[in-house]
Amino acid sequence: MKKKLLYIDHSFHNKTKSAQFLEELLCSAYDVETCDFDPYDKNPDIIFDSFTGRDFDVLVLFQVMPNIKKLKEQISFKYPVFFPMFDASGGLDDAFWEQYREFNIINFSYSLHKRLLKLGLSSYYIQYFPKPIETFDFGDPAHVFFWQRVTDLGIDMVEKLLKKNSYNRIHLHRVLDPFQTFRSPSRCIADKVEYSDWYDTREEMLKDVESYAFYIAPRLYEGIGMSFLEAMAMGRCVIAPNFPTMNEYIVHGENGFLYDYHYPKSIRINNIDRIQKNAYEYVKEGYAQWEVNKYKILDWLEAPLGGSVPLPMEKQKKEFIIKKYTFCGKFPLLILESKPYKRYYKLFGSWCVWKCKRKGNKIIFYLFGFIPVWKASYW
């Protein structure tokens, strides 16, 4: 008889099917009950009322962060497990993670895994790869696919990045995350843009992506990065911000391109066929490893708290970017320090005059680093 597992997942995955791989893996070893959690609901925790008094061997939270205290009051479980996403929790304060000290945490982001180990949490790391297509063609090198999901990464950024390259069509998929604002193309490229608002099936969208040589990653940060990984699995040339998880897969100029989001410059792209082939082969090799390693997840679900030692990476990537403006090349005048969902502007190298920080679905801007002066919706 299989043990009982309660799987609490983001309701958005009902549409995207991007978490289906994990649910199938869990079902191979457990009797799984699913719960769709909508963090944008006014009272999201009410969904747990239907599970009040129930007992489970394992509780799995995937990409959702409900009220842990209330969860414990309503549901009994022996082994709690949390799959965090870098885009949602990578920039949260250390204090946030205290509530997960009794959890085994399974990370798809190496950057977040390292941080949680430093906090003394029980963290495990595994890198996901989707199944590559059996054969691929290179697509049209003059065509670009871009899905705008967030306000801060719009068609204007695509125009900057491709300024030095020749293209005649941009497919703009305008389905945004909650609380985001669409950006219209400039007059210079408006006649090159075609639009879509949604696809009946995920397969229809992937078929369109496959016909374009270029794929612009849709967000600044990712949890796993399913969208750009599926593009790489089809041999697309992915252009992405130099942030996790994109920079944990993409090596600039080898199997894709990374850019500085705060100081974007046009990327001169040559030998695109080589980039596409490298991307495809990279995912093909990674998928073979994933098929072997994915069963470790089942071992980690009920493992004693402790976690694993960080795995060495071939190429370590910076977790944040620092820009310095100096006088005579020596004396610091202004320093811009950028971390996930945090930016600091410091005068003379130490005096913090401006900081913005994400809390929930808001970004709060602080004067002198501690006086809140403005609040805006983020996603």
Protein language model annotation of sequence segments:
Residues 1-67:
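N-terminal pre-catalytic "stem/leader" segment of glycosyltransferase-like enzymes
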Residues 16, 131-202:
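Conserved catalytic-core segment of nucleotide-activated headgroup transferases in glycan assembly
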Residues 19, 37, 65-158:
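Catalytic core of nucleotide-activated saccharide and alditol-phosphate transferases
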Residues 206, 229-233, 247-248:
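Short alpha-helical segment that forms part of, or immediately flanks, the ligand-binding pocket
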Residues 237-240:
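Short hydrophobic beta-strand element within catalytic cores of glycosyltransferases
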